[in-house]
């Protein structure tokens, strides 16, 4: 019953609708109580796990038709966006200075002041205003900063930086309200364990998001019992990048090793296994100029997104314990795209369906 692939063809959508109707019918029998489902969300750092969690919340909010983020939560998101702009600006300027890119001393001093003003906005809970916003726009568009942004993979600057800089005119407004797309672009590394409970009709979905950095992983094992599904997120676009924690280790190799440890047969004997090969949009662009074989010598296909994705899917699958292969659901995703919500809808139904089978309800 395993499935692998990310394209929602007509037949797949019809099957999803059939499964959803079956689940709805089964849940009608248990109206008096919530069906509780738990999903463990794991993967290496920078893979996009927290973004997936935001999209899960967005999907369940839409399906339950119970409103969005609270006013207080949106205010927190606004401050996080400003914090991201402050951090991204600091990283870009630091790269320019350390690598002796062509920027005069006057501009360096001006942009250091700009960064301090962004910091003050964050600390004071204010908004940036027109004058500061204009300086940020000039900063973003200047040649050395653009050059530094193009080299972002070498110093762990995320692609969200460009998104927020391009949206300065909207973000600077006093009445700015973050959209769902803004929220999923926010970068805040997960430390510790974050649990989000979302309610969808008769389903209570508890999603446990565990920090992906190496020092956080020892905490995962406390959550390995009694989960209904494991959602593992790996950034397929990072096949040429190094770990933040260890510059000698390739990020894709780290993801593969971690995945095979998790699915070695000791844990999750009844849980659905779901793999998101995330950041597929960046992967499709990157393979146009960056060799897969250079970083993964075992790759023998054409240097295309199709052959590359097929190779990495096989690498993840081949190292699994045989019992898990028949329960693996693999999707190529872009967690910042609203289209991922279609996949997440399918994942939610998959988790519920597997549990209902185990309990004999369908």
UniProtKB/Swiss-Prot annotation:
GO terms for molecular function: G protein-coupled receptor binding; G-protein beta/gamma-subunit complex binding; GTP binding; GTPase activity; metal ion binding. Residues 38-51 are annotated as: G1 motif. Mg(2+) binds at residues 50, 190. Transmembrane segments: none annotated. Signal peptide: none annotated. Residues 182-190 are annotated as: G2 motif. Belongs to the G-alpha family. This is Guanine nucleotide-binding protein alpha-10 subunit.
